[in-house]
Amino acid sequence: MARRNPLLFAIVVTILFVVCYGSALIAQTPPPVDNFVASAHYGSFKKRHGKAFGGDAEEGHRFNAFKQNMQTAYFLNTQNPHAHYDVSGKFADLTPQEFAKLYLNPDYYARHLKNHKEDVHVDDSAPSGVMSVDWRDKGAVTPVKNQGLCGSCWAFSAIGNIEGQWAASGHSLVSLSEQMLVSCDNIDEGCNGGLMDQAMNWIMQSHNGSVFTEASYPYTSGGGTRPPCHDEGEVGAKITGFLSLPHDEERIAEWVEKRGPVAVAVDATTWQLYFGGVVSLCLAWSLNHGVLIVGFNKNAKPPYWIVKNSWGSSWGEKGYIRLAMGSNQCMLKNYPVSATVESPHTPHVPTTTA
């Protein structure tokens, strides 16, 4: 997933908004942060998250990152009237570069996405006109999980999709094993990144479509290590293939409505300080993180996608983020994929396994 220099990122953002908004940007420029105010917020942040640092140099580095993030949150709030960014979240003492390195799988998408083979599936049936769907309410979404310090978002996205497709097709919801993919999938790179369709391809080619339960093969890579594959566990679900969906939000919404959750890749660079609400300006340039669409609401103002993340339930809206529909926020429509599952309750869907 793509790494970016934080200084370059700040310069590009500034140029972008000067070009787009001209003199209006002057009123939105973050004001200087008073050290006394920043210290008070920083003290509350450390207490809330149990943070303690060993020396003055590290303490100073964290405080400076926190102070800079206060300005970043202010700027993002001015651009997102329906969302809230804040420094009370657990990532507020990280620089943008540190955050990207730890949670956004640097460089992987840039190196591998060009090899992504599209096999676009188009559902020719007429749209139903359904305005809102939430698969959490339909019992097709497991609780929010936490990838930890491992760059395994791709595994959580792929497994979340399979969990959702399995339950949406009429089977009982079961939590499946991300660790099976992280440790055993030799197409992808464990904690160093992967792609959701590659993971599904490995499941089909090397695992006969079978996925182990989380209970029988629990996640152990939260510290950033990749234990050897032991390839033993209880089969909890079985897929018949996978496919790429059209890069079109209406088509993605149709799939979510009729079939269930969809795995997507996004640019999550600005998610570091997200606290809640609907993001309507994401500032996205390149894909770097895998997540799961579990629903949408077209009746809301603005209409939004419901997206499940894998940074634990203390991040965002209990582990979720809402992105405005219709404007490709965070590049959400650029890489939608889904596994397919046989079920007597749904018609057969053409699949691809390569």
Curated annotation (Swiss-Prot):
Sugar-modified residues: 208
Pfam families linked: Inhibitor_I29 (PF08246), Peptidase_C1 (PF00112)
Signal peptide: 1-24
GO molecular-function terms, A-Z: cysteine-type peptidase activity
Keyword Secreted among UniProt keywords: no
GO BP annotation list: proteolysis
Keywords, ordered alphabetically: Disulfide bond, Glycoprotein, Hydrolase, Protease, Signal, Thiol protease, Zymogen
This enzyme's EC code(s): 3.4.22.-
Transmembrane portions of the chain: none
PROSITE patterns given in the database record: THIOL_PROTEASE_ASN, THIOL_PROTEASE_CYS, THIOL_PROTEASE_HIS
Propeptide residues according to the Swiss-Prot or TrEMBL record: 25-125
Active site: 153, 289, 309
Keyword ATP-binding: no
Disulfide bonds: 150-191, 184-229, 282-330
Top-tier EC class: hydrolase
Family: Belongs to the peptidase C1 family.
Name listed for the protein in its UniProt record: Cysteine proteinase A
Species the sequence originates in: Leishmania mexicana
Organism lineage: Eukaryota, Discoba, Euglenozoa, Kinetoplastea, Metakinetoplastina
Gene behind this protein: LMCPA
